[in-house]
Amino acid sequence: MLQLVAACPESCVVCTKDVTLCHQLTYIVAAPMTTRVLIITDGYLSSIESTNLSLLFNLALLSLSRNGIEDVQEDALDGLTMLRTLLLEHNQISSSSLTDHTFSKLHSLQVLVLSNNALRTLRGSWFRNTRGLTRLQLDGNQITNLTDSSFGGTNLHSLRHLDLSNNFISYIGKDAFRPLPQLQEVDLSRNRLAHMPDVFTPLKQLIHLSLDKNQWSCTCDLHPLARFLRNYIKSSAHTLRNAKDLNCQPSTAAVAAAQSVLRLSETNCDPKAPNFTLVLKDRSPLLPGQDVALLTVLGFAGAVGLTCLGLVVFNWKLQQGKANEHTSENLCCRTFDEPLCAHGARNYHTKGYCNCHLTQENEIKVMSIVGSRKEMPLLQENSHQATSASESTTLDGSFRNLKKKDHGVGSTLFCQDGRLLHSRCSQSPGNTTAFNEAGLLTTYNSRKVQKLRNLESGEVLPQTLPHHIIRTEDISSDTFRRRYAIPTSALAGESLEKHLTNESCLHTLN
């Protein structure tokens, strides 16, 4: 908060009834009402408030340079009706801190210096009531373009000197300077101009012009300006400062012929179209805090969008996991395309439980590949020329065919909770044929069916190998060999517990 102090501080060099000169203050000193010149420099002021200057009706010159000022209150300068010179250079004043009312009561203002601040755009409404302004210095800011509205709507008919040097200007509208008919001096040096139209022909009073230290691209679009400049320098009353520095950028083949903007003509200009420049016109200034609010809203919207995307991905992965779990639990029942009992359907009683029936034939042997590769049941017709029973107890990674000695022909083996059980088909559906997943033909013959007695959980029906054991084809790379006879039920149980999970029944055997 700035203070209003009556006494003259020690840091003030001059304190008279007409002049007050101070430096390195953190406040605006309370100068006498008769003060005509108030200079406070190199201090630590953050803003200009209305209470600091409201009583200085006779003030003609106010200098607040190098104070770190960021904000100028809308009515801070309203009482300075006699002010002719306002120096605010080397501060942090931005375009958003100036309003249409900031300079509106300065009817006597002739010199306004806003050099080396943080201005990005210009609005003609700032200077609507400064009819007496003759010098406007805007050099050393961050201005990027001059549109037709930058000085439009102003009453700057008395403006003689305009300094826009050392900015970032890359675009100038064709009628940007038309509201300033009395301009005598224009400085556009040290900007980023590559192309611009002939904006100076309407300025009949122009006698000093600076365009050096830019990034001129000598295309044919620049030819009208080059023609104006050649005619301009023919008069001894006109001065084109640093004309030798109006060099073309070495970017095209035409540069070798032109070399300078002044030498550019229709015969040596580059016919290539220039790069397009996007010009953003500032329709209305953002109020203080609006930019922060806008960034907050955009950040929140982005966070919501990312959250929704994450939920969609998570839901998709969850559905995939459920599908894989369902597939694993019912792998036994999905192994075959049709029920293997011609009259029986797949049974899905509970989650993780399935019955899969396979009719046993004298002519059929069932082999199942159990391993790390995809399980694929193979049904092949028995060969009666099989090898001797000496190899009958060798188990090569796959189940041998199990022929039911005690339960008769037509019995069926099926899986329940990782155990091998026994059943029979209930009726004779007639002889049928079907293809398994391997493309082999399977024959189903009519058999009588005996209903399976109730079994307790974990019970396994004993099975033994018959005396005419048939040699099993080795169809799995995951093999192990044993050379001693063991019961069939033990083989089946051990192999199932090794290769099958507790939740899924992976294979059905005859």
Swiss-Prot record:
**InterPro entries, sorted:** Leu-rich_rpt, Leu-rich_rpt_typical-subtyp, LRR_dom_sf, LRR_TM_domain-containing
Write out the entry's keywords from A to Z.
Leucine-rich repeat, Membrane, Repeat, Transmembrane, Transmembrane helix
Q: List the disulfide bonds.
A: none
Subcellular location(s) of the protein: Membrane
Instruction: One GO cellular component term, please give it.
Output: plasma membrane
Annotated ranges, domain LRRCT: 214-271
Q: Per the UniProt record, which residue ranges are transmembrane?
A: 294-314
One Pfam family this sequence matches: LRR_8
Per the record, membrane topology reads: Single-pass membrane protein
| LRR repeat start-end pairs | 34-55, 58-79, 82-102, 108-129, 132-153, 158-179, 182-203
> Which spans of this chain does the record mark as coiled coil?
none
Task: Tell me what this protein is called.
Answer: Leucine-rich repeat-containing protein 53
